[in-house]
C-alpha cells in the first residue's frame, strides 16, 4: 500500500478473493461469531461502510493536497472524486432496488398449523401481489427474485478506492513532500480500514455464500472503479473531470514546496 505497484495489482487480488472466497465455506464453522449477521463488525461498519470510507480517506486526501498546495480549490478538486463515487453508489442502489422490485415477488409462508400441507419439509407459499421488497421483508414474509449483493459491491468499491487514493503517498514521500504526524496517522487509519474491508469481504464470502449475486456485486464494484480511475479520471483535471490521485501533488521542489 502507498505505492503504484500495489495500486496496479490490487484489483487482481480482489477479483481472486471474490471468485474463490466462497470456497472457504467448506472449512469455516457456522457456529463462529462471524456467522451471525448481528455481529458488532457487521452492524458498526458494514452498514455504514461508505461513511467510514469518506471520513478517513476524505481526511487523508484533503490534508495531503492542502499540505502541498495550500489551495482549497485543489483540495476540493481531489475530494470531488469521493463525491462522484458516492453519487455512483447511491445511483446503483436505486437501480438495484428498482430491478429487485420489478423482478421479484413476495410470498407468505403457510405453516402446517394453519391446516396447510408441508412439501419436502417446506411450507407452501402464498403469493402477495403488489408488495415491495422492503414492505415484504418488514412484515416477516419471504421475498424471492433477482438480487445483487450490495454489500459485496460496496466493499469492492471501497477497497479499490482506498487503494487508489493512498497509493500516491509513497511517491509523495520519495519526492520530499511535507508529511507531519497527522498525515501519517491518517494514512495508517486508511491501511487499517482497507484491512477491515478485506476481512469483512472474506467473512461475507465464507459465511454467507450466495452465487451468483456476490459475483455480480463484485463485478459491478470493479467495473465502477475501472470506469472512474482507469477511464474518466485519466482525461486529466478540467471543469468536468477531477483528474487522477496525485495530479498536481507529486511535483515537489527541493524545499518541499510544489512547483
Describe each region flagged by the PLM.
Residues 1-259:
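Terminal transmembrane helix and immediately flanking juxtamembrane interfaces
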Amino acid at each position: 500500500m502507498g505505492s503504484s505497484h500495489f495500486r496496479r495489482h490490487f484489483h487482481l487480488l480482489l477479483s481472486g478473493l471474490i471468485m474463490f472466497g466462497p470456497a472457504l465455506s467448506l472449512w469455516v464453522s457456522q457456529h463462529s461469531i462471524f456467522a451471525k449477521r448481528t455481529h458488532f463488525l457487521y452492524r458498526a461498519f458494514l452498514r455504514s461502510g461508505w461513511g467510514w470510507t469518506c471520513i478517513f480517506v476524505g481526511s487523508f486526501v484533503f490534508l495531503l493536497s492542502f499540505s502541498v498546495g495550500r489551495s482549497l480549490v485543489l483540495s476540493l478538486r481531489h475530494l470531488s472524486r469521493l463525491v462522484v463515487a458516492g453519487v455512483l453508489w447511491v445511483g446503483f442502489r436505486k437501480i438495484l432496488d428498482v430491478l429487485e422490485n420489478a423482478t421479484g415477488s413476495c410470498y407468505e409462508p403457510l405453516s402446517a398449523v394453519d391446516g396447510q400441507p408441508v412439501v419436502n419439509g417446506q411450507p407452501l407459499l402464498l403469493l402477495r401481489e403488489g408488495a415491495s421488497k422492503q414492505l415484504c421483508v418488514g412484515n416477516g414474509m419471504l421475498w424471492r427474485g433477482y438480487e445483487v449483493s450490495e454489500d459485496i459491491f460496496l466493499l469492492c468499491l471501497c477497497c479499490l478506492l482506498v487503494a487508489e487514493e493512498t497509493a500516491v503517498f509513497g511517491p509523495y514521500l520519495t519526492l520530499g513532500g511535507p508529511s507531519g504526524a497527522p498525515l501519517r496517522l491518517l494514512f495508517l487509519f486508511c491501511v487499517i480500514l482497507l484491512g477491515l474491508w478485506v476481512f469483512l469481504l472474506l467473512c461475507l464470502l465464507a459465511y454467507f455464500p450466495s452465487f451468483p449475486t456476490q459475483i455480480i456485486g463484485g463485478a459491478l464494484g470493479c467495473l465502477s472503479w475501472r470506469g472512474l480511475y482507469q477511464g474518466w479520471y485519466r482525461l486529466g483535471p478540467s471543469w468536468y473531470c477531477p483528474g487522477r490521485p496525485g495530479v498536481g501533488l507529486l511535483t515537489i521542489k527541493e524545499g518541499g514546496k510544489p512547483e
